[in-house]
Amino acid sequence: MKKPLVIALMAGVFLSSCIKDYIGHPGEEPDKGLLGLKFTKIGTFINGAGDEGFAEISAYDDKTKRLFIVNPNDGEVSVWDISNPSSAVKQSGISLTGTPNSVDVHEGVLAVAVENPNKQANGSIALYDIESLQLLETYTAGALPDMVTFSPNGKYIVAANEGEPNDDYTVDPEGSITVIDLKKKEI
C-alpha cells in the first residue's frame, strides 16, 4: 500500500512542473487531469472535541476499515469506522499517557509515536492490536518521537525523534532515529 502511494507522490511532484499546461483557463470546465483522475468528496467529519478538529496524522487499515487519527488535544488516537466513507462512525479511542504524534499500521498492528509529558525526555513507540486495540508492546524512543513508520516488509519500525529544546534552552536533546527490530523485539 505504501509503495504505490510513494510512487504516486513522487510522480505528482515530478509532473507538477507541467501542470500549468493541463489546468485550462478561467471559466473553462476542468478536464480529468493528467492521469484521467477526478476526485470527488464523499464524506467528512470532525475529529476531536468542539468546533475544531484534529487530524494531523492518520493511518488506514484496509482489513478492519478503520482510520486511526492522532488527536493530541484529547490525548488519544481516535478510531473511526469508515467502512461507509460517507457516514464515518467514531469508535472508542486509545487513551495515552503522553501526546500521540504519529501513527502507522501494518498487518494487524498499529504503531503510535508517543511524546513524553516532559518533551526533553525519551518518548515511546507503543504497539496495539488493530482489532482489539489492546497494547502489545512498548519501546523506548528518543526525545519527542515525531514520526513512526513500518518498513515495507514489516520487520522494522523506524521513528524520527525531533529532540526539541525547553523554553530557556537549558536542555536541548539531540534529534535521533529509533529503529526497532520486531522479530528480535529490540531497539
Model-derived features: positions:
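Generic cytosolic/nucleocytoplasmic N-terminal low-complexity/intrinsically disordered segments
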Residues: 1-2, 19, 40, 64
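Sec-dependent signal peptide recognition
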Residues: 2-8
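Bacterial N-terminal signal peptides
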Residues: 8-16
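Bacterial Sec-dependent N-terminal signal peptides
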Residues: 15-38
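Mobile, glycine-rich extracellular loop/lid and propeptide segments
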Residues: 30-187
